[in-house]
Amino acid sequence: ENAAATAEGAVAEAVQNSPVTLRGSLCILTGYGRCGSAIHQCLKNWGCTIVVYDCDENACERAKEAGAKICEYKDLSKVLKKAAFLFNTAPSAVWTERVLEGVPQEVCILELASMPGGIDRESISMSCRAFRDVLRRVHQADCWERRF
C-alpha cells in the first residue's frame, strides 16, 4: 500500500537526517488521512509521543482513538518548540511564517504532502539554515511507483 511505503520512507528519512533518536521523541503530525494514520502507527511502534493536528474533527477523533494527543491550531507553535520531529501530510498551508516563528534549529521537518505542501519553505530557510539539510520531499507523485 502506498501509505505504508510513504510512512516507512518518512521514518527512514527522519532517522537518517536528525541528530536525535526517533525512539521516545515528541513528534508532531499534521494531517491524519491515509498517510498520516500510517505514519502515526510507525511512530507509535517506535515509542514516540505523537501530537496530531487536523482541521477535520473526525480525523482528530480517529487519531485520539489510536492513541495520539490532539493539538489545536492555535497551539501548534508552542508544541513545535518542544518537538524533535515534524511530519506534515496536510496539503494546505498549516505551517505559516507565524506558526514557524521561533522554531528550534534541531527540529527535523519532513514535508510529505502533495504540492504546494503545508509548510512555508521560505520561512524555514530564512529562520533556520539547518532546515535546508533536513527538509525532504519523501513522497513525490511518481517516486513510489518507480521504487515499489
What do the PLM-derived regions correspond to, one by one?
Residues 46-66:
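NAD(P)-binding Rossmann-fold cofactor-contacting core
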Residues 65-139:
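Rossmann-like adenosine-cofactor binding region
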Residues 23-44:
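Glycine-rich adenosine-cofactor-binding loop
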Residues 30, 53, 110:
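Active-site flanking residues adjacent to catalytic metal/cofactor-binding acidic residues
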Residues 1-24, 118-148:
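Adenosine-phosphate binding glycine-rich loop
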Residues 39, 59, 120-123:
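Residues within well-ordered alpha-helices
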Residues 35, 58, 115:
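Conserved Rossmann-like nucleotide-cofactor binding loop
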